[in-house]
Amino acid sequence: WKPQNQIDITTLNEAGSLQEAESIWEKHFILHHLKRNNWDIDETCKILKTSKKQFQKKLKYHSIEMPESEAPPSQKRYPQRTLKRSVVLCGSSLHSGIKTGLILQPMPAGSGIIFGDIASGKTIPAQLENVQSTDYSTCLKKGVNSVGTIEHIMATLHMYRVTNLLIKIGDEAPVMDGSAKDFCELLEDGEFEDQDDFYEEIVIDKSYSFGDKEKGEPYISIEPSEKFSVSYHMEYPEPIGVQDFTYEFDGDESFKKEIAPARTFGFMEEVAQLTKMGYASGGKLDNFILLGDKKVINTKLRFEDEFARHKILDILGDFYLLGKPIRGKIKAHKSGHTQNVGLLKKVRESLIEKN
C-alpha cells in the first residue's frame, strides 16, 4: 500500500528519523483522505486502491479513531472528478451509419457534463431539459444542434463518477461493439483526477413511479435505499424470453465487469422497418446482437442474461441526466428510454419543489 498524493505536513519537523517521518506523513495522509471522503472507509479504500483489511491495519497501527457516527447519506460529500488528459475514440454511429468519434476533454470543477459539436463549437449540457427524443435511443437538442445515442457514454461517466467533462462529438455517439466496454477503457486511458470541489449524491427520499405495471405496461420506479441498485425484468419473444437481473453499484469495477460488456440488440424483422424510419442504418454484424428465427444469429452471448443487463446500462445512462450520481433502488419492468425519462421528470419536479 503506497500513498500517491503529497500534502504539506509541518509536524514532519518533529521527526527524529526518516522512519518516524514516513510514519507521521502516512498518518496525516490517511486522515486527509478520510476527512475528504466523510470518514467513509469503503470510498477511501477505493480511491487509495487498497483492501479494507489492509487499510484497517493501518488505522490500528496509527491509532486513528473513527467518529462515533458518520454523516447521514444526504450530507455525504464526494470530490468532483474529471480526466487528467484528453482522449479520442473513433467508430461509427448506429442509427445514421456514418463514421464518427468523440474527444473527451477535462473540465474545471462545477462544469458538469457537456456535449460540444465539433463542427460549430456549440454546446449542449447533458441535462434532462435538453432531451429531444427517446425513440430507440436518447437524443439531446439545444437550438439547432443535437446529439444522439448518448446513453452508453453517459452510463460510463455515471458509474465512474466523472462529474466534469467536455465531450466533443458530431450528431451521434459511436456505437463501438454495442456495449460500453470501449468507453470504460477510454476513461481509464485518460486517468481520473479528483478535484477540490465536492458534490452530494441525489438521495432518493420517497418512492416515484412511471407507467402502470398492473396493466402490463412498461413500468419503472425508484425508492429510498442505502445503496444504488437497478433491477430489470423483461419479457420478449424467444430467444430472449423472460429475463431478470439486479445490479448493485459497488464501484466502477463492478460496472465494468457486470454491465458495461452487455450489447444492444435487435430482431431481424425490425431492422428493415427501422432503416426505413431512419434508424439502424449503421447496424453491422459486429456492433449489436442480431436475433431471428428464435435464435442469436451473429454472435455468442457474453452473459445468459445479456439483454436485461443491457437495459440496465441504458437506465444508468439516462439517470445521469439529473446531473449527479443517484442513491436509490430502481425497479424496471419492460421499460425503455421513454419511461426512464418520464420517471426522471417526476424526480426532478420533486427536487425543485423541495429546494
Task: Give residue spans per PLM region.
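Conserved C-terminal helix/linker of AAA+ ATPases
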Residues: 1-5
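C-terminal regulatory domains involved in ligand/effector binding and gene-expression control
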Residues: 71-164, 168-355
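Bacterial C-terminal helix-turn-helix
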Residues: 7-71
